[in-house]
Amino acid sequence: MIGYASRTGTRRNLDALRAAGWRLMVSARGALRTEGFPYALDNGAWTSFQRNEPFDTVAFERAVDQLGAGADFIVVPDIVNGGIASLTRSRHWWEKLRFTYDHIGHVPLLIAVQDGFDPRHVVPLLSPRTGVFIGGTTGWKERTMRRWAALARSRGAICHVGRVNTARRIRLCEAAGVDSFDGSSASRFAVTLRPLDLARQQTDLEGYIARKAA
């Protein structure tokens, strides 16, 4: 299972993350630097939400232009705490990214799901080119991640969980059979990386079998 840490400019933390084999999650609302890491590209909606600002379309498009082609995947714009209404925004951007950004044609696009979503809402979109980003509240993520991971596998798609900052939640991700997760704890506090990475490396038999069967 792949761990992504929020991009940081702190050299000590970057060195620790690199040594542990983690990757970076680069936000469209942050510095567009990869620090030489493999990376994924986040749409920046969470940062806008935290600042009580509207979604920054210009920042997202700039990030896609500069970093999209090299990303492991791109998180399609969503509405934080928007419920199923978020899917309308995501579908709009999903179509735009697929048909107007030729340079990212090989990069998987991840649709963010959250409280209020049901598999039937997104299953027509899923494929090896379109995966699932599990957002929403912590409780909802923990209750539903196994279902979303199984759905993604059935469509040959990636399943990623956002904002995972404890060893317990990393173990839940592993048991659910997801492909990757991201969090900010290891970026901000190098001392937390070791327990988080130990949890990442602990293979859960059910999760391992599920991923191998995909």
Show where each model-derived region lies.
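Non-catalytic, usually N-terminal nucleic-acid engagement modules in DNA/RNA processing proteins
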Residues: M1-R98, A210-A213
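Glycine-enriched alpha-helix->loop->beta-strand junction motifs that scaffold or abut catalytic
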Residues: A19-R23, G36-F37, G70-A71, V107, ...
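Conserved, mostly hydrophobic/aromatic
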Residues: D42, I111, C173
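Catalytic cores of alpha/beta
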Residues: P54-R62, R120-L125, C159, N165-G183
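Alpha/beta enzyme core
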Residues: Q66-A69, K96, T100-I104, G116-V132
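Distinct, well-ordered alpha-helical segments
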Residues: L87-H92, F117-S127, T144-W148
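Glycine-rich adenosine-cofactor-binding loop
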Residues: T130, G135, K141-I170
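Glycine-rich phosphate-binding active-site loops on the catalytic face of alpha/beta enzymes
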Residues: T137-T138, E174-D204
